[in-house]
């Protein structure tokens, strides 16, 4: 009879063994785990089991075993303390923190000055004060990043990458939140836009739209591009760089730490290399990386400026008698309309480099298109040093260039038909002048020309650069 009573006794939470319950709790998210504390005394005790909080500390706050040991706290206590500090950013913190950690780890041995230029994180009250100053709420992922590092000191090189031609130099610093607030825009064309970066040489900035205005999506990151054909200064086109701050920052960091952007003279150069953009002829390999320059480009009139970096290398296993010298270059340039231009000239960047086993020669040049994309291909002509009468061609792989997605200014979209037709005629005349001004020239990246520093509310003056090959 007693055995039958035992078998028929109801199964309660209190009577369940501990291990199965802990296993079930291990699948819960932190919110559900906290809620379990209010269900019963038994679940409250089990939910405080410290190993359950280890996963959440690692998942949301990236807290390592070493950090736990240093702080001499249990996992649950660490989770609660961190949540009290940055809990409003829990949906963004792990991605942003990982990006910062990866970036610093990668740059410390390669660009130590850049890492030293980073500022300590801002306080919540600092960010609240900026919101009060600009009259807009900052995106949570932006605030999260600035809690970790409040930008960098305005020094060269900038954290957000550099670009150099013989007569042009750009290096973008990540602005601290107070400096950014000083450049917050309320003028027509850039209403409710906050600068993220600034180049002291060109005045170039990347902006984030903290509010949806003038055709921009909220939280979008972009380069401004004044409409040079419009009489309205509010007509500003945009090259879109990221859909959100997180998208913008993490994609940039991934390009850096994956080796996608080369480190040259302690600076991050924003050249993109396609692994398939390599051609080998005999013992010589040619590879190409490219970059779009928004500060020298415009949508109206269509003028898209690209720079490319070419690496020419002879295999270290080549025979000494294979040493050779570059005599000339040939280019076949095709735009998105299928229009083809052929260019031939002596040397490259005014030089006639000698290539020998194991030696590498690199140079930078640039080109422009009146279409949003295009490609180049061609060959170099060499002669052997030991057999000067013997010449041969080395293939340059086809490499494609395309500008980022852009959005046309809402001021242009709102124009009347008569004004629009007049502007279209002016654009066609401008395109014809650009074609007439094209020249066959090479540019090296050795001599850098600094430009005068400009303030945020002054539109960038676009320089017309001839096409360089």
UniProtKB/Swiss-Prot annotation:
Record-annotated membrane-spanning stretches: none
Superkingdom classification of source: Eukaryota
One Pfam match: DUF525
Domain ApaG per the UniProt entry, residue ranges: 278-408
PROSITE patterns given in the database record: APAG, FBOX
Function comment: Substrate recognition component of the SCF (SKP1-CUL1-F-box protein)-type E3 ubiquitin ligase complex, SCF(FBXO3), which mediates the ubiquitination and subsequent proteasomal degradation of target proteins. Mediates the ubiquitination of HIPK2 and probably that of EP300, leading to rapid degradation by the proteasome. In the presence of PML, HIPK2 ubiquitination still occurs, but degradation is prevented. PML, HIPK2 and FBXO3 may act synergically to activate p53/TP53-dependent transactivation.
Matching NCBIfam families: PRK05461.1
Identification of the protein by name: F-box only protein 3
Organism name: Bos taurus
Gene that this polypeptide is encoded by: FBXO3
